[in-house]
A protein has these predicted regions:
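Short acidic alpha-helix initiation/capping motifs at coil-to-helix transition points
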Residues: 48-53, 83-87, 131-139, 161
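Short, thiol/selenol-centered motifs that function as redox-active sites or metal-ligating centers
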Residues: 71-92, 164
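Acidic/histidine-rich alpha-helical segments that form the ligand environment
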Residues: 119-159
Length: 189
C-alpha cells in the first residue's frame, strides 16, 4: 500500500466486487497508469451510478465554450483554495498532457500581479476566488467579470466552481491526497 492510500480515512478497496467496478478499475488504470485513490476509497463503496455521475461532469465539461486552458485555470483555482491535493494533482496532470503553459499554472497563486494572466482571466479568477472562499460575490466583482464574458460563459464558470467543489469535498472528506499523477504524466511525455 502506498502512502496516499495509508492516509485516507477509509481503507482503499484493492479488489472490487461487481463487474462495473472492476471495469472502472481497469479503465482508470489504463488511462492513468494506476487505479485512482478516489475510485478505491469512495467509488468502490457506492453503486455504479455515483461513479457515472463523476464521469458525467467530465462529459459536460466537453460542451463548454470557454477555452480549455480557462476551464483548467478555474478548476485549479478552486482546488487550490480548497486545498484538495488530489484535485490539484489530477488537474495539473491533464494540463501537462495537453501541453499547456505550466508556468502559468505555477503562477496561479499570483494571478493578480503576474504578467502571464490577462485582465479577462484576472476578472474570472477574482470571481472564482471570491465565490469559492467566501461563498458570496460582491456586485463589483461580478460586474468586472461580466465585462469580459458572455452570459453563457459566466454560467459555465459557475458550473466549473460548483462541480469542482463536488470533487474537492469528496476527496477532502475522505482525506484523499495526491496520487502523484503529475509525475506519471511527465514520464509519459
Amino acid at each position: 500500500m502506498d502512502m496516499t492510500q495509508a492516509r485516507t480515512f477509509l481503507p482503499a478497496i484493492e479488489k472490487p466486487e461487481g463487474l462495473m467496478m472492476k471495469l472502472a478499475y481497469f479503465f482508470t488504470w489504463r488511462q492513468f497508469g494506476k487505479v485512482l485513490t478516489p475510485v478505491k476509497v469512495h467509488s468502490a463503496r457506492l453503486p455504479a451510478a455515483f461513479g457515472m455521475f463523476y464521469g458525467k461532469i467530465g462529459q459536460l465539461d466537453k460542451k463548454l465554450t470557454l477555452p480549455r486552458e480557462m476551464v483548467f485555470l478555474v478548476r485549479e483555482q478552486v482546488a487550490r483554495i480548497n486545498v484538495c491535493e488530489f484535485c490539484m494533482d489530477i488537474g495539473r496532470s491533464f494540463t501537462i498532457q495537453a501541453s499547456m503553459n505550466q508556468a502559468k499554472f505555477d503562477a496561479l497563486g499570483e494571478y493578480g500581479t503576474s504578467v502571464l494572466f490577462s485582465d479577462k482571466e484576472r476578472a474570472a479568477l477574482d470571481y472564482v476566488a471570491e465565490l469559492t472562499r467566501d461563498k458570496n460575490v460582491k456586485p463589483e466583482t461580478f460586474a468586472r467579470m461580466a465585462r469580459h464574458y458572455s452570459e453563457r460563459e459566466i454560467c459555465e464558470i459557475v458550473w466549473l466552481v460548483a462541480s469542482e467543489h463536488v470533487y474537492n469535498m469528496t476527496n477532502i472528506g475522505l482525506n484523499i491526497h495526491s496520487d502523484m499523477l503529475c509525475d506519471i504524466s511527465r514520464k509519459k511525455r
